[in-house]
């Protein structure tokens, strides 16, 4: 049974659940519906697990080439490919049905869209054929917090849009950092990620620009009246520090692999801090800060 758990990538599920909690509690505004919270977490977990199993099935030919993925269950033959398809399908159907039944049709629809983008667009085509694969994949990576938010709100409003922007833009430097310190793996598997296709220097430029872009919706969550001043202080601190780490990559004597690994690790710190702060420093009434300042 261990291999059936591993193929769902528990680490990725856990990381996504942190963002789901952030979106859910932000929308809850202090009024927590515990059954809805638990069922939303379960539904998203099942859908993410399904996507990961499908990804393992699709990528088994390149996973055997890459050092970090060569011991995955499907590569080692611990799970038959056909069985993995049935397993992934069952997980996905269960997760989407649970979100539809326990939350609302919008949450289920967002899960379906995120799943289609990740499995159908990113994994099946973009990852192997386009340097823009990471950009497309970032949209699916941003789905969980938006699902958590919409499970409570029942609508895709400006708060949901801001969350989508925050988590999509965060994915880019996070993913490019991985591609830099795993450069040889991606190169050997012929995966056209930006650092391999355009070079590490160009990737550094993109990382810096995406972090700057990421800071805008991060600020908008405060200016839009969704989060408070404590959120603003923490979000600003981690974002500026992350940007500083990115800029340190331009030093001549820098070890690109070590720099990228540190940048990757801090990207996790950054998004975790944001998720925690939006969970605890929400605004009961989302009144835009700029509007509230008017006489």
From Swiss-Prot:
Pfam families for this protein: UbiA
Major place of residence: membrane
Protein name as annotated: Protoheme IX farnesyltransferase
Topology of the protein relative to the lipid bilayer: Multi-pass membrane protein
Enzyme Commission no: 2.5.1.141
Reaction it catalyzes: heme b + (2E,6E)-farnesyl diphosphate + H2O = Fe(II)-heme o + diphosphate
Lineage top rank: taxon: Bacteria
Record keywords, A-Z: Cell inner membrane, Cell membrane, Heme biosynthesis, Membrane, Transferase, Transmembrane, Transmembrane helix
Pathways per UniProt: Porphyrin-containing compound metabolism; heme O biosynthesis; heme O from protoheme: step 1/1
């Amino acid at each position: 049974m261990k291999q059936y758990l591993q193929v769902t990538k528990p680490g990725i599920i856990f990381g996504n659940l942190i963002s789901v909690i952030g979106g859910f509690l932000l929308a809850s505004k202090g009024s927590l519906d515990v059954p809805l919270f638990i069922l939303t977490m379960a539904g998203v977990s099942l859908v993410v697990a399904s996507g990961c199993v499908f990804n393992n099935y699709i990528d088994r030919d390149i996973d055997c080439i890459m050092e970090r993925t060569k011991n995955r269950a499907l590569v080692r033959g611990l799970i038959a490919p056909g069985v993995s398809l049935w397993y992934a399908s069952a997980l996905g159907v269960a997760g989407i049905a649970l979100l539809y039944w326990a939350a609302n049709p919008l949450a289920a629809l967002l899960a379906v869209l995120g799943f289609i983008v990740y499995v159908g667009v990113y994994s099946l085509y973009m990852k192997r054929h386009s340097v823009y694969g990471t950009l497309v994949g970032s949209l699916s990576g941003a789905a969980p917090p938006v699902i958590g938010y919409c499970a409570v709100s029942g609508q895709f409003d400006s708060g949901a849009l801001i969350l989508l922007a925050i988590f999509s833009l965060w994915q880019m430097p996070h993913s490019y950092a991985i591609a830099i310190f795993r450069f040889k793996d991606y190169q050997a598997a012929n995966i056209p990620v930006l650092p391999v296709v355009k070079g590490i220097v160009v990737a550094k430029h993109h990382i810096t620009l995406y972090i700057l872009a990421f800071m805008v919706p991060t600020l908008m969550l405060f200016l839009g009246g969704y989060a408070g001043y404590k959120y603003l202080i923490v979000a600003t601190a981690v974002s500026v520090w992350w940007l500083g780490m990115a800029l340190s990559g331009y030093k001549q004597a820098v070890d690109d692999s070590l720099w990228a690994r540190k940048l990757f690790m801090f990207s996790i710190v950054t998004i975790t801090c944001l998720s925690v702060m939006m969970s605890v420093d929400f605004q009961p009434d989302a009144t835009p800060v700029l509007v509230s300042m008017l006489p």
